[in-house]
Amino acid sequence: MRSSQTLSKYIDKATDQFNLEPNLALNIEIADLINEKKGNTPREAALLILKRVNSANPTVSYLALHLLDICVKNCGYPFHFQIASEEFLNGFVSRFPNHPISRMNKIQSKMLEMLEEWNYMLCKNNRHREDFSRIHDIRELMAFRGYKFPAVDEDSIAVMKPNNSLRSAQELAREDLEAHKAKLQELLRRGTPMDLAEANALMKVIAGYDEENTEDYSALAAADLESIRSKALRVKQFLVNQTVSLEEGTLADAVESLKVYQTKIARILREENEDEYYVQKLLSLNDLLINVIEECSNSDLIHSGTNVVSSQPNVVESHVPPSSNDTKQESSLIDLMKLTEEPAVPSPSLPTNVPANQSLSMLSSLSNSMSSTSNGALNSPSYSQAAIPNTNSSLTSILQSDSLMISTQLTSVQKSSGFASYSVQFSNCSLTWPVSEVVFQVAVVKSLKLQLLPHTGDAIIAPGKQNAAHEIMNITNIPADASDLRIRWRVQWIIGTDHRVEQGESHLPL
């Protein structure tokens, strides 16, 4: 009951007629609340927002449409299923007469634009498209009556695009289970004989009794790997014969796409330890991606972006043997980030486990999966050294770009035993797009030992959200007379579909 009151209060505040513009931070908070509470919350939110959309006050309607747009793009299947319901859609198009008038107002134009986006992303490019068929039906009916729908803006829908999607069988199963539970709850709520019959069939699927209608997630995951393999081979063919067409349009974009796949493969390898056959396929594909990316980086077809094109180190748990390509790549990254004896300006960062037999610790990538948003070309990494002061005096920001901020905070230090612990925090500085696929790499001198505890917080950092993800970093073997710890770091992430790379040198204060 309290969550319902909170939700209603937030929606009223976000769509207040005295707001001069949409409150993006509050809209994102409402979307987070819907995702967190689940249950009946998506339905309540959809109907509350719909009521505000149909307000007689155009300001309230306009703000409600912006809130609805944020919720659709940041919430998952449970909310999408509600906006595809007959009750919601009938209320949504109630503003429109049977036949179009000569001139649409701003509210109606925005609604047509949103309906076209939903049709494109939910009815044509979604695994559960059959559950959203009413959106397509209402769109076709309005088109038949003469309504003209605007072209879909690629930048606007990029956050919902399934581009570069690679999920393991377990992830696909979890995604479907969440969708089935949300659909089952709604069918039981309606309670018509037809809905109850469908709910009964759905419960058999959830329980695993109806194997005939249960997806083979292993086959789906394997098909995704084969699709990526085909793309990699096509890029390899392109290097020999430029008449071969690439899905991404340019070689740089194609290589960028392969890099994103490689990051996701590294994450899945860390999590997957049961299906040995699937693990071997991942390792084989990972080796292929490394080879193709390396060939591209040495090709004359790419002139300026070779640093970004170079492949990432393969990250696998100790039970998976590293390939020769992995060793070669680690060496290239170590050379790139080799520590020098030059003084550096203070500034902190993020690490992993370190062997003591090298002048520099091995780099280990820490990837976090997130959503996408806008199209962008390959970016060359920029080099940052100076620490940027944070508004919180206990935090030191080692990176503060227009989309990602990384800060560190010393949480514990024992100089007598040579131990220090840091909290590394990730924030999204963008007010438009979420940040995803963060891969942070750190190098330290061989005398230090590093331990990174498991990632906590948001995998997808919503626009404007501060300190949404955290890592705890423990460092040992610190000399007793040390006043700071010198490191070099490299980070890459995705803001929308735009891949960013930064690298720098920092000092962690003690």
Curated annotation (Swiss-Prot):
Record-annotated VHS domain positions: 14-150
This protein's GO CC annotations: cytosol; Golgi apparatus; nucleus; trans-Golgi network
InterPro entries associated with the record: ARF-binding, Clathrin_a/b/g-adaptin_app_Ig, Clathrin_app_Ig-like_sf, ENTH_VHS, GAE_dom, GAT_dom, GAT_sf, VHS_dom
Database matches in PROSITE patterns: GAE, GAT, VHS
Signal peptide: none
Domain annotation GAE: ranges: 391-510
Alphabetic keyword roster: Golgi apparatus, Protein transport, Transport
Limits of the GAT domain: 177-301
Any one Pfam family match given in the protein's UniProt record, by short name: Alpha_adaptinC2
GO molecular function (one): ubiquitin binding
Places the protein is found: Golgi apparatus, trans-Golgi network
Example GO BP: Golgi to endosome transport
Coiled coil residues, start to end: none
Record's function text: May play a role in the regulation of membrane traffic through the trans-Golgi network.
Name the record gives this protein: Probable ADP-ribosylation factor-binding protein C1F3.05
Organism: Schizosaccharomyces pombe (strain 972 / ATCC 24843)
